[in-house]
């Protein structure tokens, strides 16, 4: 019985590479000369540092551009609020989302059931498993989910025949 998993996970290696490229560009740009602007990473948490709001926006733009070039969807990023640290310096914590949330998993299961395609969807931790009798049914479910779920990037993996 063919099946696949619906997951939502960023490629952390590409995220790390994008951060390194961002830091390199920030260190060489003229408008950041003499400032302490940078991006740091701890596991799934990124911290953006800058001297003022404008430079923080520029750091964010550089990071988003580098992530886009490395095919990492920016919808994985969850921005925290901007905090003041010593002096005029600012920092912002950005979390990289992982897994299909409970609400999104329920929405996916409901969409699959309402589509009247002969497949079953079940929630498996932070993924949704879809089982069906025909591969064509599974492919039509993938197409339907790509069309209907636009607020979160979805990946489809673990195909079984």
Curated annotation (Swiss-Prot):
Entry GO MF terms: nucleotide binding
Q: Which SUPFAM superfamilies does the annotation name?
A: YajQ-like (SSF89963)
- Keywords per UniProt: Nucleotide-binding
Looking up Gene3D superfamilies in the UniProt record yields:
3.30.70.860, YajQ-like, domain 2
List GO terms (cellular component aspect). cytosol
Q: Which domain of life is it from?
A: Bacteria
Note the PANTHER family from the entry.
UPF0234 PROTEIN YAJQ
Its family remark reads: Belongs to the YajQ family.
Q: What does this protein do?
A: Nucleotide-binding protein.
Q: What is this protein called?
A: Nucleotide-binding protein Bcep18194_A5887
Q: Which organism is it from?
A: Burkholderia lata (strain ATCC 17760 / DSM 23089 / LMG 22485 / NCIMB 9086 / R18194 / 383)
């Amino acid at each position: 019985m063919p099946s696949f998993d619906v997951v939502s996970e960023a490629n952390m290696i590409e995220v790390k590479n994008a951060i390194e490229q961002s830091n390199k560009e920030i260190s060489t740009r003229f408008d950041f000369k003499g400032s302490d602007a940078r991006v740091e990473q701890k596991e799934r948490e990124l911290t953006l540092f800058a001297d003022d709001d404008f430079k923080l926006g520029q750091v964010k733009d550089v990071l988003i551009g580098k992530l886009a070039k490395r095919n990492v969807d920016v919808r994985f990023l969850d921005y925290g609020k901007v905090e003041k640290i010593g002096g005029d310096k600012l920092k912002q914590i950005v979390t990289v989302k992982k897994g299909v949330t409970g609400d999104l998993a329920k929405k996916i299961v409901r969409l699959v059931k309402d589509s009247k395609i002969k497949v079953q969807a079940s929630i498996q931790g932070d993924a949704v498993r879809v089982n069906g009798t025909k591969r064509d049914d599974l492919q039509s479910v993938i197409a339907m989910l790509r069309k209907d779920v636009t607020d979160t990037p979805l990946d489809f993996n673990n195909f079984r025949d």
